[in-house]
Design a protein with these regions (language model features):
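Beta-propeller blade signature
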Residues: 72-85
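Loop/turn-rich, solvent-exposed surfaces of beta-rich toroidal or solenoidal domains
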Residues: 1-29
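Beta-rich, blade/repeat-based domains predominating
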Residues: 1-10, 38-53, 74
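Conserved beta-strand positions in repeat-built beta-propeller and related beta-rich domains
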Residues: 11-16, 53-62
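Structural signal for beta-propeller blades
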Residues: 19-21, 62-64, 77
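Surface-exposed loop and turn segments in beta-propeller and other repeat-based domains
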Residues: 91-97
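Short, conserved, GDST-rich strand-edge loop motifs in beta-rich repeat architectures
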Residues: 58-74
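Surface loop/turn motifs at the tips and blade-to-blade linkers of beta-strand repeat domains
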Residues: 33-37
Length: 97
């Protein structure tokens, strides 16, 4: 579903319906796979002051009709720990008050 890049040029992809996030290199080779407690992962991004926190969002409602006890991470933000990567600044916006 959603995706982002890290500072080394890897692409991180949220895998809707697969309950995981993949880290791919420039050739498309999977370098890491992180399994999550949510089936429908929606997006992934780097956060924090130095963009070293990897945050994943998941959907609470889906057409798949998963039982809540089978998808206890649904509708939550999940932080992936131990990934040893950092993000790159994308776009910044100034929102007027």
């Amino acid at each position: 579903d959603g995706m982002c890049f890290d500072s080394e040029g890897h692409i991180w992809v949220a895998m809707w319906g697969a309950g995981s996030v993949l880290k791919l290199d420039q050739t498309g080779t999977v370098r890491a796979k992180y399994c999550l407690p949510a089936v429908n992962v929606t997006n992934v991004c780097f956060a924090g002051e130095v963009l070293d926190r990897l945050i994943v969002s998941s959907a609470r409602i889906s057409a798949d009709h998963h039982k809540p006890e089978e998808d206890y991470g649904a509708g939550q933000l999940i932080e992936i720990m131990g990934h040893k990567s950092s993000g790159i600044k994308q776009c910044q916006a100034q929102i007027p008050k």
